[in-house]
């Protein structure tokens, strides 16, 4: 996302939520003296920003069902091969091919990696609206499965990527072993971030997310091997 898009998202967020002005400056790239604090929880290494000037960590808490911006404003919903089966069955499709044909889009897009290296992704994405087109990939569209109460009509069989928010994750090769890493997505859409002196308040969330994030990365990697998605680096 561009800084302009993030600022627009923050402006929209602040119409309904109080958002710490220090965090706003950080999200907009105006605070740059930041330490990447890495902590291993089970099989995932989390990268938590530490603001040196404030001597504070950035933590996160869940505001659902009062907030469901992650469902209203996600840019895409890439599916794993597991998702193709479970969601297809949930939508009463007798075979996966018909589900893919009618309910998904195959798109190719570029994403910056954690080191700044560009990654080209090709994924099968769930349509967030019935008539979504490939040209709308990456734009904010409210998910058609979100009901008036802020709940997902597919739950618990919603896409695996939905369970990751607000984290982004990736794999790194460490001495021949794949290691899962995760950090926050700062898109300007989530009111759940706050400043804290230590990580104690978020220990339970990190434990729960470590399992979710690890399992998703294994499923995503398997999806690549099975030919339902592709990744290349430039």
Regions found by a protein language model. Give the residues of each.
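Short loop/turn segments that flank or connect secondary-structure elements
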Residues: 1-234
């Amino acid at each position: 996302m561009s800084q302009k898009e993030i600022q627009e998202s923050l402006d929209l967020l602040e119409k309904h939520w109080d958002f710490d002005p220090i965090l706003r400056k950080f999200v907009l790239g105006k605070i740059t003296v930041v330490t990447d604090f890495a902590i291993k929880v089970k099989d995932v290494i989390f990268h938590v920003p530490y603001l040196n000037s404030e001597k504070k960590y950035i933590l996160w808490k869940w505001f659902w069902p009062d907030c469901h911006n992650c469902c209203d404003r996600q840019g895409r919903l890439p599916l794993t091969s597991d998702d193709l089966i479970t969601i297809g069955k949930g939508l009463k499709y007798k075979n996966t091919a018909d589900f893919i044909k009618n309910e998904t889009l195959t798109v190719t897009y570029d994403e910056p990696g954690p080191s700044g290296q560009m990654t080209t992704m090709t994924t099968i994405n769930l349509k967030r609206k019935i008539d979504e087109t490939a040209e709308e990939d990456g734009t904010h569209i409210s998910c058609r499965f979100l009901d008036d109460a802020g709940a997902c009509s597919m739950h618990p069989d919603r896409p695996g990527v939905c369970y990751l928010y607000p984290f982004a994750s990736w794999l790194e090769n460490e001495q021949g072993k794949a290691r899962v890493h995760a950090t926050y997505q700062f898109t300007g859409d989530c009111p759940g971030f706050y400043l804290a002196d230590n990580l104690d308040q978020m220990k339970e969330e990190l434990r729960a997310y470590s399992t979710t994030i690890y399992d998703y990365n294994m499923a995503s990697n398997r999806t690549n091997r099975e030919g339902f998605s592709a990744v290349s680096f430039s």
